[in-house]
Amino acid sequence: MSAGLNEREYNIILHKGVDYGEFFNSLVDITNKDGIPNRKVTIANPRNGSYRQTHFYLTEVEKKQLLQHPSVLDIEIPPSKRTDIIKSIDAIQNSNFTRDPQLNAQSNNWGLVRSSYKDNPYGGNNETGLKYNYTLDGTGVDIVITDSGIQSNHPEFQDKDGNSRVQDVNWASLSGLSFTQHINHNRDQHGHGTHVAGTAAGKNFGWARNAKIYSLKISGLEASSDTGTGIDDDYAFDAIKLWHRSKPIDPNTGYKRPTVVNMSWGYVREFEAGGNLHITHRGLAYPSASLSQAKSKGLNSFSTSQKWRIPYRVTSVDVDIQELIEEGVIVVAAAGNSNLKQTDISNIDYNNGVTVDGSSTYYYNRGSSPFHSTDITVGAIDEAQYNNDGTYIDQKASYSDNGPLVDIYAPGSGIISAVTDDLIYAKDDYQYDDNFMEAILSGTSMASPQVAGIAALYLQSSPGMTPAKLKSVILANSSTQVHNPSESPSGSFSFNVNTPKLVFNKYGNSNPLEYKGDFTTTSNISF
């Protein structure tokens, strides 16, 4: 069905715990209950994978009426139909690193060693001489990479028999939803998704070396040459929920195969760096603020000559994340690369915002979607180390978002992994087969799959863990302190340098677990 005169598609999102069926049935019936339009409203998308969301065709007046209903949390234009927000999968690439591999030099993901030791084994040095001796490989776990796609024939994703572990699936058929998946959905012409997958589950660069890998290309994350091959957020999230819900019990474990979803992307709003800035910071107004004054109040940008990017929260996306986790899905998400504090409504910085030339206010300390307090939000540590009176401490990467909403940190700078020929950054021949490519990238996009891969190892050991239990176990086992050089006496950043926050693989070198199974590569990878 299409929209009628003066109608457009809106997603009605309900509060948790209300009678969803009664509310939505009232909309499609000719009734007038508590401000619900007195006509039969047409469904635009039934959202069969969501209990709390349905898309309807409404007028602007009807939307405003429904927003007053006590059952309604929010009403939004679906993200795929908005032009004021975009998805970002920015990665950063530099030419020199201290604790990082070099292309074409038989190097590897240094995160494998760093996150397998509680204490920093590098001690201020670039090399350790240590090996990554792994005991678990993610067998029995499914990892979903929501990104730009995955190059499924890359050797990094082979199993011990040389077959690709990237599953060739049609998400519409897998979930039973009525949308059409593009014939070229299962490819990557950007390279970001392939790199992320290699870190989470590659056989040389990754953690979960025998996990099954699923690619779900998100609309808006495709390469410019690949536009239109992704799946819109609403169908993508519903597909994962319905697929996980319908999984059978694995006879080898007595549980469903665990599902880990990595999300190395986020929503942002852009605005020009010039113009008349009005800053609100901690309840104080700074009209006609300069760029330097804006930065001093915690608003960071890539460059004053470029558009500024502000993390943006989308209610429907965050509700989808909550519903995924309630289904039992593990969600791991990148914090973002804006060096911004992320905080909740209880914090003094929650309402920090900027207004440009009298436009609407952009709040910059609330983080970005996808997010929910029950997911695992990951910041990045740097290749450089902080010298604390002779003790070398891992430090937050200069670009990484931080603050109370960031749950844990992982190596994110100078991470080598598999990529496609199409990657826009510098790349070189894959060191194990020169018909393919590898590259070194930096970003919280690279840190998030480190945690997703380690999560798969925990789930291989204990496949019945709930998302809440897994998160608590990962945080309880977190490693040594992370120094945040962005922290200032004024409290612009609130990350406590004494809090253990670095992800730790307890099934690695420090605490080996007796495990017998098929491994996709040999152990003893040198660093």
Show where each model-derived region lies:
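Hydrolase catalytic cores
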Residues: 197-200, 214-221, 259, 412-493
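Acidic glycine-/aspartate-rich tracts in secreted/extracellular proteins
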Residues: 17-19, 80-81, 148-152, 157, ...
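C-terminal subdomain of the subtilisin-like protease fold in secreted/lumenal serine endopeptidases
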Residues: 211, 215, 237-241, 248-265, ...
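Short glycine-/aliphatic-rich beta-strand segments at the starts of folded cytosolic domains
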Residues: 3-15
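Autoinhibitory propeptides
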Residues: 31-114, 337, 383-384, 395
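Structural recognition of the beta-strand scaffold that forms the well-ordered cores
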Residues: 11, 142-146, 198, 212-217, ...
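Substrate-binding/specificity loop regions of serine endopeptidase catalytic domains
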Residues: 267-407, 414-451
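Active-site core segment of subtilase-fold serine proteases
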Residues: 94-199, 205-212, 220-224, 228-231, ...
